[in-house]
């Protein structure tokens, strides 16, 4: 068993179709936290041109080791999809965050996905938002990479990429749920 397999078994939980318990982590203004456990990937390395180019905003990709997306900050749900593969939120300090699970997963029509929140819901950092079946995504021929993007960059005074870890897998850092990823300040 390799290091990545060992980490997967460490982080994997059973019964992900039911609402998982909330995670608990401290929050600070302007900070977007890792919404899932996994291996951090530079956005420019995500195999999707619109995402990799930064056209949609700045952020990270995360190769997930678990199948639940948690709120990366306090805020409210600003967008949902009927296919449950992506979600948008507006943080308490006005940051617009878009989380997308997988590439091409819209074609799955919601199979393998469950959403635990609705449009307009107020959420706390660490609250479960979406669960997804990584094996179903791969069986459908898609990648399960999760992208976390801050959009509407013209509203920002600054954005700093802080996602890092001392543990490297294939040269990329491992991130745990609740690790800081991005620090942004609005104008």
Task: Label each region the model flagged.
Residues 2-187:
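Contiguous, well-folded functional domains in the mature portion of proteins
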């Amino acid at each position: 068993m390799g290091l990545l397999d060992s980490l997967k078994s460490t982080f994997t939980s059973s019964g992900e179709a039911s609402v998982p318990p909330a995670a608990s982590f401290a929050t600070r203004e302007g900070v977007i936290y890792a919404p899932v456990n996994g291996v951090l990937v530079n956005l420019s390395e995500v195999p999707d041109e619109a995402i990799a180019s930064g056209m949609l905003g700045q952020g990270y990709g995360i190769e997930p080791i678990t199948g639940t997306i948690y709120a990366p900050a306090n805020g409210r749900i600003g967008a949902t999809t009927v296919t449950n593969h992506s979600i948008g939120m507006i943080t308490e300090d006005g940051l617009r965050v878009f989380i997308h699970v997988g590439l091409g997963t819209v074609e799955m029509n919601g199979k393998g996905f469950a959403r635990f929140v609705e449009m307009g819901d107020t959420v706390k950092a660490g609250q479960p938002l979406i669960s997804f079946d990584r094996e179903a995504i791969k069986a459908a021929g898609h990648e399960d990479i999760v992208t976390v993007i801050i959009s509407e960059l013209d509203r920002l005074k600054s954005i700093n990429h802080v996602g890092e870890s001392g543990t490297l897998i294939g040269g990329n850092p491992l991130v745990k749920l609740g690790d800081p990823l991005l620090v942004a300040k609005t104008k």
